[in-house]
C-alpha cells in the first residue's frame, strides 16, 4: 500500500542520486546539490488562497463571540473594484487592532496567520498601484462584527476576480 502526500513536490530522490553518481559533480558542490534536492523534495508547497483567509476570518468571528471588545475599526463597506488592494491593506492593518484589543493568544495566532496568507497572495500578484482610493483613516469606523462582514465581502471580490 502506497501512502500519498499531496502537498509534497514529486521529486524522486533516486533521480538525484543517479545524476550525482553518474556525473562529474562528485565534489563538495555536487553533494550540496544532492542534499538540497533531498530537502526540497520534503518541503510542502505553500500556496495560499483566499478560501483559507475566509476560514481564518470565520474563526476570528467565532473566537470574539465570547468576548466584549468595544473597538471601532476603519471599514470600507463599499469597495470599488479598482481599489480592492488598497482596501485589503487597510483591513489587514485594522486586523492587528483586533489582535491587540483581544489579548487572546488564539486570536493573535489566527490574525498573524491570516495576515501572512493575505500578504503572500497580494505579493504574488505583483506591485499593484491604485490611484484615487481612500486612505485608511478616511474610512468609516464600524464595530468588529460589521468590520468582519465587510472583510469577508472584499475577500470574495478577490475570489470572484480569479
UniProtKB/Swiss-Prot annotation:
Protein's UniProt keywords contain Lipid metabolism: no
Protein name from the UniProt record: Interleukin-15
Name of one Pfam family that matches: IL15
Signal peptide annotation: 1-29
GO biological process: immune response; interleukin-15-mediated signaling pathway; neutrophil activation; positive regulation of cytokine production; positive regulation of immune response; positive regulation of peptidyl-tyrosine phosphorylation; positive regulation of phagocytosis; positive regulation of T cell proliferation
Annotated Gene Ontology cellular component terms: extracellular space
Maturation-removed propeptide residues: 30-48
Gene that produces this protein: IL15
Taxonomy, superkingdom: Eukaryota
Protein role: Cytokine that plays a major role in the development of inflammatory and protective immune responses to microbial invaders and parasites by modulating immune cells of both the innate and adaptive immune systems. Stimulates the proliferation of natural killer cells, T-cells and B-cells and promotes the secretion of several cytokines. In monocytes, induces the production of IL8 and monocyte chemotactic protein 1/CCL2, two chemokines that attract neutrophils and monocytes respectively to sites of infection.
Alphabetized PANTHER family for the sequence: INTERLEUKIN-15, INTERLEUKIN-15-RELATED
Disulfide bridge partners, by residue number: 83-133, 90-136
Compartments (UniProt record): Secreted
Carbohydrate attachment residues: 127
Family listed: Belongs to the IL-15/IL-21 family.
GO MF, one annotated term: cytokine activity
UniProt KW keywords: Cytokine, Disulfide bond, Glycoprotein, Secreted, Signal
Protein species of origin: Macaca thibetana
Amino acid at each position: 500500500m502506497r501512502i500519498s502526500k499531496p502537498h509534497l513536490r514529486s521529486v524522486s530522490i533516486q533521480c538525484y542520486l543517479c545524476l550525482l553518481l553518474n556525473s562529474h559533480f562528485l565534489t563538495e558542490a555536487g553533494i550540496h546539490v544532492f542534499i538540497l534536492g533531498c530537502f526540497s523534495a520534503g518541503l510542502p508547497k505553500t500556496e495560499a488562497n483566499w478560501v483559507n483567509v475566509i476560514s481564518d476570518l470565520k474563526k476570528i468571528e467565532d473566537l470574539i463571540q465570547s468576548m466584549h471588545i468595544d473597538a471601532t475599526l476603519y471599514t470600507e463597506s463599499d469597495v470599488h473594484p479598482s481599489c480592492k488592494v488598497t482596501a485589503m491593506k487597510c483591513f489587514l492593518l485594522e486586523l492587528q487592532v483586533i489582535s491587540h484589543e483581544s489579548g487572546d493568544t488564539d486570536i493573535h495566532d489566527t490574525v498573524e496567520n491570516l495576515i501572512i496568507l493575505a500578504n503572500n497572495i497580494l505579493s504574488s500578484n505583483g506591485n499593484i498601484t491604485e490611484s484615487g482610493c481612500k486612505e485608511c483613516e478616511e474610512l468609516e469606523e464600524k464595530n468588529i462584527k460589521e468590520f468582519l462582514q465587510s472583510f469577508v465581502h472584499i475577500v470574495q471580490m478577490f475570489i470572484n476576480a480569479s
